[in-house]
Amino acid sequence: MRVLGIETSCDETGVAIYDTEAGLLANQLYSQVKLHADYGGVVPELASRDHVRKTVPLIQAALREAGLQADDIDGVAYTAGPGLVGALLVGATVGRSLAFAWEVPAVPVHHMEGHLLAPMLEDNPPAFPFVALLVSGGHTQLISVTGIGEYRLLGESVDDAAGEAFDKTAKLLGLDYPGGPMLSKMAQAGDSQRFTFPRPMTDRPGLDFSFSGLKTFAANTIRSNGDDDQTRADIARAFEDAVVDTLAIKCRRALDDTGFKRLVMAGGVSANRTLRQRLGEVMAKRGGEVFYARPEFCTDNGAMIAYAGSVRLLHGASQTLGVSVRPRWPLADLPAV
């Protein structure tokens, strides 16, 4: 089965073609970072309009990359949520329209299920069961995963997601949008001993997160210590260490609670090298394994949507002609297959 995947949940337009026998055949991506940079964040209306301009050309490019024609596609998968409602509607409308025209089934895909399953695209995919750390600009969640659609929420952020905290703190440090990756690069030159940031909610039981206080702590530290280059690097290092330590502590607790030996990390922040190294050390000490996707599949992309859609379509999932999206959509609401 060859599935066309369309991702338009936020500020990346992603299109990919996944073959259940041959693997990934095409992957096209357009980022709107430059479009939104002057505003310091994503402007929903601008995002939607840009998806309108880019989605169909990217579909054409994906077909060319794969050497396929429209009648070679067996199904269409599109992100139906969570995300920006206008942006979601673009991908959903295009996906449903193509499925109707091509007379193939279409399936709505949960954006975070796409992230969760992205490591399945790698040569050494994780086996069930596992604990998943979904960590991005919009979500920070720990999930017990025992099968496709068998998801149990263990803990989540009660305020800012980790990726959001990275971007907001980067802005305080004078970095351009999106600042998270630049903050991590700056942190490499920082002194880990100069500042100590708190590890929020690690002093009590539970698996929930809170990152908004770290942003406030960073702002106060900047005001008290100036903003020369070395001080900014030291603050970036202290902030990143605090986030990574907090995530690692909560992952250990989740693994203890479930008894699982495998950890999957997914979402944009899972590309962070410091986080990968730390969780690799955690799992090595436990005699377990950690899995993650290659960096280009950590951020939003069409490949993860095409793959997740192929799994659902193989088990008979499809949707009627109606186009519906869900800006808010709990992962636990998905049916098992």
From Swiss-Prot:
<dbReference type="GO" id="GO:0005737">
    <property type="term" value="C:cytoplasm"/>
</dbReference>
<dbReference type="Pfam" id="PF00814">
    <property type="entry name" value="TsaD"/>
</dbReference>
<keyword id="KW-0012">Acyltransferase</keyword>
<keyword id="KW-0963">Cytoplasm</keyword>
<dbReference type="GO" id="GO:0061711">
    <property type="term" value="F:N(6)-L-threonylcarbamoyladenine synthase activity"/>
</dbReference>
<dbReference type="InterPro" id="IPR022450">
    <property type="entry name" value="TsaD"/>
</dbReference>
<keyword id="KW-0408">Iron</keyword>
<feature type="binding site">
    <location>
        <position position="111"/>
    </location>
    <ligand>
        <name>Fe cation</name>
    </ligand>
</feature>
<feature type="binding site">
    <location>
        <begin position="134"/>
        <end position="138"/>
    </location>
    <ligand>
        <name>substrate</name>
    </ligand>
</feature>
<feature type="binding site">
    <location>
        <position position="300"/>
    </location>
    <ligand>
        <name>Fe cation</name>
    </ligand>
</feature>
<feature type="binding site">
    <location>
        <position position="167"/>
    </location>
    <ligand>
        <name>substrate</name>
    </ligand>
</feature>
<keyword id="KW-0479">Metal-binding</keyword>
<dbReference type="InterPro" id="IPR043129">
    <property type="entry name" value="ATPase_NBD"/>
</dbReference>
<feature type="binding site">
    <location>
        <position position="180"/>
    </location>
    <ligand>
        <name>substrate</name>
    </ligand>
</feature>
<dbReference type="GO" id="GO:0005506">
    <property type="term" value="F:iron ion binding"/>
</dbReference>
<feature type="binding site">
    <location>
        <position position="272"/>
    </location>
    <ligand>
        <name>substrate</name>
    </ligand>
</feature>
<protein>
    <recommendedName>
        <fullName>tRNA N6-adenosine threonylcarbamoyltransferase</fullName>
        <ecNumber>2.3.1.234</ecNumber>
    </recommendedName>
</protein>
<dbReference type="InterPro" id="IPR000905">
    <property type="entry name" value="Gcp-like_dom"/>
</dbReference>
<keyword id="KW-0808">Transferase</keyword>
<keyword id="KW-0819">tRNA processing</keyword>
<dbReference type="GO" id="GO:0002949">
    <property type="term" value="P:tRNA threonylcarbamoyladenosine modification"/>
</dbReference>
<dbReference type="InterPro" id="IPR017861">
    <property type="entry name" value="KAE1/TsaD"/>
</dbReference>
<comment type="similarity">
    <text>Belongs to the KAE1 / TsaD family.</text>
</comment>
<feature type="binding site">
    <location>
        <position position="115"/>
    </location>
    <ligand>
        <name>Fe cation</name>
    </ligand>
</feature>
<comment type="function">
    <text>Required for the formation of a threonylcarbamoyl group on adenosine at position 37 (t(6)A37) in tRNAs that read codons beginning with adenine. Is involved in the transfer of the threonylcarbamoyl moiety of threonylcarbamoyl-AMP (TC-AMP) to the N6 group of A37, together with TsaE and TsaB. TsaD likely plays a direct catalytic role in this reaction.</text>
</comment>
